[in-house]
């Protein structure tokens, strides 16, 4: 199958020397016979260099082509354009684990070329909705605020909402280091024998990042020995903007192959989706389309959905794809089109907070605006622990009340607060200092995080823990009276 597909991509099509204009990353061609939407073209410049492009728009005998490597040096005298008759396909193989590629999928780690097991369309194959399986079973990140209060189900898509200057890269690297499937103590031996740990893989796609960030991730994966289960795709800030549009699609095509053909549980991390949205806006402006909110194209919601909706699980296939896109909110504005539309498509969000960061709390995850919509299906008896849901609800309630008391204290002073209010203030401080805060290399499994949560909840008398049933309190509250 693979050789035939390869042969198709090499099929020589018609060549044209009819470039009529260049606009930003786009080339306009006239007198083209039968161009196809999304067809791949090879552009040969006067100096002999070749670039790749893709047909974006067809109007009779006119074709608009976006050039992945940029349009500098393209003229209407010496440039020839060859239409291949193929859509953009990427070679995929199990050997891609442990390798580093550029945003177009070419190896940049001085290793040998990939021997492809298949060539797959980067837009992905459509999935029958009735064949999708509901995401279940928790992915453990080792970060208490995520695991206890915003649990991520296998097959979920949940973004990190961050902003400039916040440690989203460090959090993403920590998740990559620590992420794995939940194992009970009595199950860990069995899981090790069954090779469950070997079944976990990470596909990491960086779009528009600077060299420092790219080196940080590369070094982090290599130093921690997790590189062998990671595939990296790096589109740097000085790489062509247009390449950012295909980078997440190539990464997801690789993830789909690893998940559905190789049976792996794949975690896909996409950073920074704001750079992707800006690339989309640049192409839209070059095409002179009617702009939407803040200059972004009106179809950005649909376009983002074609990326995010590729997460999930399929009936009869062992693997799964879990997505954690990272986006930086310009001016910390959650109403900006990119986070706004992302929030509509994805199943929750994890909010990285500047105030917590300014107080030297790492990871600065604010649990109040954070949400995991599929948490209920990933936790509970048999998956984590029977008290998980109740503990999470009680932590949310007490933290929210603690925030209100803190605001009231600023107005009326501490003397006017009741003894009950002071308990909430004590909880607020200990929750942020002991539960939210943890080291970048401090891994807590879900059972350690739940035990830590109970230590904090014992600050309160039983009567104030309204969200936890009496049966659960009988089992867990009196284990250890100290706090």
Curated annotation (Swiss-Prot):
Keyword Transport carried by entry: yes
Pfam family, one: ATP-synt_VA_C
One GO term of the biological process aspect: ATP metabolic process
UniProt keyword Disulfide bond, yes or no: no
Domain of life: Eukaryota
UniProt keywords, alphabetically: Hydrogen ion transport, Ion transport, Transport
UniProt-recorded Gene Ontology molecular function terms: ATP binding; proton-transporting ATPase activity, rotational mechanism
An example Gene Ontology CC term for this record: proton-transporting V-type ATPase, V1 domain
Alphabetical list of SUPFAM superfamilies matching this protein: P-loop containing nucleoside triphosphate hydrolases (SSF52540)
Protein's job: Non-catalytic subunit of the peripheral V1 complex of vacuolar ATPase. V-ATPase is responsible for acidifying a variety of intracellular compartments in eukaryotic cells.
UniProt family annotation: Belongs to the ATPase alpha/beta chains family.
Subunit structure, interactors included: V-ATPase is a heteromultimeric enzyme composed of a peripheral catalytic V1 complex (main components: subunits A, B, C, D, E, and F) attached to an integral membrane V0 proton pore complex (main component: the proteolipid protein).
Protein name per UniProt: V-type proton ATPase subunit B 2
Phylogenetic classification of the source organism: Eukaryota, Viridiplantae, Streptophyta, Embryophyta, Tracheophyta
């Amino acid at each position: 199958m693979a050789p035939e597909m390869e042969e198709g991509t090499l099929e020589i099509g018609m060549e044209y020397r009819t470039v009529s204009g260049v606009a930003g990353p786009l080339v306009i061609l006239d007198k083209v016979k039968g161009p196809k939407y999304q067809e791949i073209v090879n552009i040969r410049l006067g100096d002999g260099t070749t670039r790749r492009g893709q047909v974006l728009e067809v109007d009779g005998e006119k074709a608009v082509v976006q050039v992945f490597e940029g349009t500098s040096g393209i003229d209407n005298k010496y440039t020839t354009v060859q239409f291949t008759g193929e859509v953009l396909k990427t070679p995929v193989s199990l050997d891609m684990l442990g390798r580093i590629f550029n945003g177009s999928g070419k190896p940049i780690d001085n290793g040998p070329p990939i021997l492809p097991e298949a060539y797959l369309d980067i837009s992905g194959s459509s999935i029958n909705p009735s064949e999708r399986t509901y995401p279940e079973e928790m992915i453990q990140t080792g970060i208490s605020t995520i695991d206890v209060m915003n649990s991520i189900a296998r097959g979920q898509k949940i973004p990190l909402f961050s902003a400039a200057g916040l440690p989203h890269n460090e959090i993403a690297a920590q998740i990559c280091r620590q992420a794995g499937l939940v194992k009970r103590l009595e199950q860990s031996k069995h899981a090790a024998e069954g090779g469950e740990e070997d079944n976990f893989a990470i596909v990491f796609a960086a779009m528009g990042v600077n060299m420092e960030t790219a080196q940080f991730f590369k070094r982090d994966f290599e130093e921690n020995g997790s590189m062998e289960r990671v595939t990296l795709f790096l589109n740097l800030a000085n790489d062509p903007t247009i390449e950012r549009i295909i980078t997440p699609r190539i990464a997801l095509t690789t993830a789909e192959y690893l998940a559905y053909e190789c049976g792996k549980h794949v975690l896909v991390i996409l950073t920074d989706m704001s750079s992707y949205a800006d690339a989309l806006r640049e192409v839209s402006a070059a095409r002179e389309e009617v702009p939407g909110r803040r200059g972004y194209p009106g179809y950005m919601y649909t376009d983002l959905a074609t990326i995010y909706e590729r997460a999930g699980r399929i009936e009869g296939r062992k693997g799964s794809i879990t997505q954690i896109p990272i986006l930086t909110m310009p001016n910390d504005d959650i109403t900006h089109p990119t986070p706004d539309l992302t929030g509509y498509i994805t199943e929750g969000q994890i909010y990285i907070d500047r105030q917590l960061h300014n107080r030297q709390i790492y990871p600065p995850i604010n649990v109040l605006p954070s949400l995991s919509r599929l948490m209920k299906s990933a936790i509970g008896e048999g998956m984590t622990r029977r008290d998980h849901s109740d503990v999470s609800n009680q932590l949310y309630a007490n933290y929210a009340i603690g925030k209100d008391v803190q605001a009231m204290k600023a107005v009326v002073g501490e003397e006017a607060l009741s003894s009950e209010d002071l308990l909430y203030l004590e909880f607020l401080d200990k929750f942020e200092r002991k539960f939210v805060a943890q080291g970048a290399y401090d891994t807590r499994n879900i059972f350690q995080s739940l035990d830590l949560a109970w230590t904090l909840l014992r600050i309160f008398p039983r009567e104030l823990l309204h969200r936890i049933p009496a049966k659960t309190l009988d089992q867990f509250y009196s284990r250890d009276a100290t706090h």
